[in-house]
């Protein structure tokens, strides 16, 4: 959430930045007008309360002197009524301000490229060269079925579209991948967490999913719980409402969890395969950092995600997302896209973001600066390290062989009992 004081004092600069994210200046002008009304009413109510205190003292004195205080009592009753009326107006204005400011996206960092959509993202670098096949390649969903390791038909029967069963060596490959990913992150100083897979509405608000993106989630009827769309939500909210000792920062968390997404608005997109599912595993990275080091931490986090792809020897590229394509809470985002041969393109497999103090303000996550003892908002960062199902898809396609088998990446073999190939049964 943005700082209302910052909007008030730097209105033109904030408006210019939010315009690059699709926010109209009219919205901010309305917010500014409401803020001015609120501040004026606060002055009025303070003046009235001061008058009420004077009237109260006059009544007390009149009673001590056994004089008639009926006029002062009437005056105080009128003051109380006026204060109550202003408080009601303030409550309405506060609600209007909240309804606007909670759905405003974060302002982009100065280094973020300005653009409207994914076409304006900027490629930063590439790693690895896409393999040149000398045979007709198969898509990962066809490979998965032929190898008897992925079963979409029964997933659809048991649950519905965009669900599947991993089976046999498919289940083992998925498990090997997330164990490998977690082990790599632990080497980089992350603390492993197993979080709740359901959170409350306050947690969803804290990380920015609520109120704007409720339609993208699965809420449990009759409860206040929501299935997590990403482990970012419980990991970040771990410190919601807390004040952390500044000496402990930065703090790194990593977790493997299922992620649940309704995929509202994705009808007709990626209807086959592992790219877009309602339920999938993802290894998440979350950081809590001081403002002065958060962008250094973003580069490290992105490198942590790249490390996984490099050790799996999967070609990828890194993009700096433009203002129009970044997520709601992000101030800056790098996307990692892995090469998917059957689609002859790169597809997103990780997104690493610095939200600066946007989530910290919503969730009231603060730290006590050891230098001056002051309590300040920290910066939160999050990134995929990686989306496991999409990594399975990339391995099946990039490591496929002409005979229909799939070579297991060397770094995963210790996690699969030394197995080197997944062969057709």
Swiss-Prot record:
<keyword id="KW-0648">Protein biosynthesis</keyword>
<feature type="binding site">
    <location>
        <position position="284"/>
    </location>
    <ligand>
        <name>L-serine</name>
    </ligand>
</feature>
<dbReference type="InterPro" id="IPR045864">
    <property type="entry name" value="aa-tRNA-synth_II/BPL/LPL"/>
</dbReference>
<dbReference type="InterPro" id="IPR006195">
    <property type="entry name" value="aa-tRNA-synth_II"/>
</dbReference>
<dbReference type="Pfam" id="PF02403">
    <property type="entry name" value="Seryl_tRNA_N"/>
</dbReference>
<dbReference type="InterPro" id="IPR010978">
    <property type="entry name" value="tRNA-bd_arm"/>
</dbReference>
<comment type="pathway">
    <text>Aminoacyl-tRNA biosynthesis; selenocysteinyl-tRNA(Sec) biosynthesis; L-seryl-tRNA(Sec) from L-serine and tRNA(Sec): step 1/1.</text>
</comment>
<keyword id="KW-0436">Ligase</keyword>
<feature type="binding site">
    <location>
        <begin position="230"/>
        <end position="232"/>
    </location>
    <ligand>
        <name>L-serine</name>
    </ligand>
</feature>
<feature type="binding site">
    <location>
        <position position="384"/>
    </location>
    <ligand>
        <name>L-serine</name>
    </ligand>
</feature>
<dbReference type="GO" id="GO:0005737">
    <property type="term" value="C:cytoplasm"/>
</dbReference>
<dbReference type="GO" id="GO:0005524">
    <property type="term" value="F:ATP binding"/>
</dbReference>
<dbReference type="InterPro" id="IPR002317">
    <property type="entry name" value="Ser-tRNA-ligase_type_1"/>
</dbReference>
<dbReference type="InterPro" id="IPR033729">
    <property type="entry name" value="SerRS_core"/>
</dbReference>
<protein>
    <recommendedName>
        <fullName>Serine--tRNA ligase</fullName>
        <ecNumber>6.1.1.11</ecNumber>
    </recommendedName>
</protein>
<feature type="binding site">
    <location>
        <begin position="261"/>
        <end position="263"/>
    </location>
    <ligand>
        <name>ATP</name>
    </ligand>
</feature>
<dbReference type="GO" id="GO:0016740">
    <property type="term" value="F:transferase activity"/>
</dbReference>
<dbReference type="GO" id="GO:0006434">
    <property type="term" value="P:seryl-tRNA aminoacylation"/>
</dbReference>
<keyword id="KW-0067">ATP-binding</keyword>
<dbReference type="InterPro" id="IPR015866">
    <property type="entry name" value="Ser-tRNA-synth_1_N"/>
</dbReference>
<dbReference type="GO" id="GO:0004828">
    <property type="term" value="F:serine-tRNA ligase activity"/>
</dbReference>
<feature type="binding site">
    <location>
        <begin position="348"/>
        <end position="351"/>
    </location>
    <ligand>
        <name>ATP</name>
    </ligand>
</feature>
<dbReference type="InterPro" id="IPR042103">
    <property type="entry name" value="SerRS_1_N_sf"/>
</dbReference>
<keyword id="KW-0547">Nucleotide-binding</keyword>
<keyword id="KW-0963">Cytoplasm</keyword>
<comment type="similarity">
    <text>Belongs to the class-II aminoacyl-tRNA synthetase family. Type-1 seryl-tRNA synthetase subfamily.</text>
</comment>
<dbReference type="GO" id="GO:0140096">
    <property type="term" value="F:catalytic activity, acting on a protein"/>
</dbReference>
<comment type="subunit">
    <text>Homodimer. The tRNA molecule binds across the dimer.</text>
</comment>
<comment type="function">
    <text>Catalyzes the attachment of serine to tRNA(Ser). Is also able to aminoacylate tRNA(Sec) with serine, to form the misacylated tRNA L-seryl-tRNA(Sec), which will be further converted into selenocysteinyl-tRNA(Sec).</text>
</comment>
<dbReference type="InterPro" id="IPR002314">
    <property type="entry name" value="aa-tRNA-synt_IIb"/>
</dbReference>
<dbReference type="GO" id="GO:0016260">
    <property type="term" value="P:selenocysteine biosynthetic process"/>
</dbReference>
<keyword id="KW-0030">Aminoacyl-tRNA synthetase</keyword>
<dbReference type="Pfam" id="PF00587">
    <property type="entry name" value="tRNA-synt_2b"/>
</dbReference>
């Amino acid at each position: 959430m943005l700082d209302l004081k910052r909007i008030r004092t730097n209105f033109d600069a904030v408006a210019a930045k939010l315009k690059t994210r699709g926010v109209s200046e009219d919205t901010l002008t309305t917010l500014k007008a409401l803020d001015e009304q609120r501040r004026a009413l606060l002055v009025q109510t303070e003046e009235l309360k001061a008058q009420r205190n004077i009237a109260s003292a006059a009544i007390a004195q009149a009673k001590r002197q056994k004089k008639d205080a009926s006029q002062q009592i009437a005056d105080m009753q009128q003051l109380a009524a006026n204060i109550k009326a202003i408080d009601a107006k303030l409550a309405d204005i506060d609600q209007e301000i909240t309804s606007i400011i909670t759905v405003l996206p974060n302002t982009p960092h100065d280094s973020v490229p300005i653009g409207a959509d994914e076409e304006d993202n900027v490629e930063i670098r590439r790693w690895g060269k896409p393999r040149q096949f000398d045979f007709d390649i198969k898509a990962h969903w066809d490979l998965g079925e032929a190898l008897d390791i992925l079963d979409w038909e029964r997933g659809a029967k048991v649950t519905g579209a965009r669900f599947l069963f991993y089976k046999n060596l498919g289940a083992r490959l998925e498990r090997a991948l997330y164990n490998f990913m977690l082990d790599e992150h632990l080497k980089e100083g992350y603390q492993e967490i197993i979080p709740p897979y359901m959170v409350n509405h306050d947690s969803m608000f804290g990380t920015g999913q609520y109120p704007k993106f409720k339609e993208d989630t699965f809420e449990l009827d009759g409860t206040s719980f929501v299935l997590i769309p990403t482990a970012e939500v419980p990991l970040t909210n771990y410190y919601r409402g807390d004040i952390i000792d500044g000496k402990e920062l930065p703090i790194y968390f990593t977790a493997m969890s299922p992620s649940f997404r309704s995929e509202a608005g994705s009808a007709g997109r990626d209807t086959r395969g592992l790219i877009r599912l309602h339920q999938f595993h993802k290894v998440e990275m979350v950081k809590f950092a001081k403002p002065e080091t958060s962008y250094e931490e973003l580069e490290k986090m992105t490198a942590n995600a790249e490390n996984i792809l490099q050790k799996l020897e999967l070609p990828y590229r890194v993009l700096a997302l433009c203002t129009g394509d970044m997520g709601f809470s992000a101030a800056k985002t790098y996307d990692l896209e892995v090469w998917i041969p059957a689609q002859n393109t790169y597809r997103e497999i990780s997104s690493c973001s610095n939200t600066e103090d946007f989530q910290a303000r919503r969730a009231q996550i603060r730290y006590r600066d050891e230098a001056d003892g002051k309590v300040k908002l920290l910066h939160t960062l999050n990134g995929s390290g990686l989306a496991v199902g999409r990594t399975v898809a990339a391995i099946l396609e990039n490591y496929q062989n002409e005979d229909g088998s799939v070579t297991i990446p060397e770094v995963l073999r210790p996690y699969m009992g030394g197995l080197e190939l997944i062969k057709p049964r």
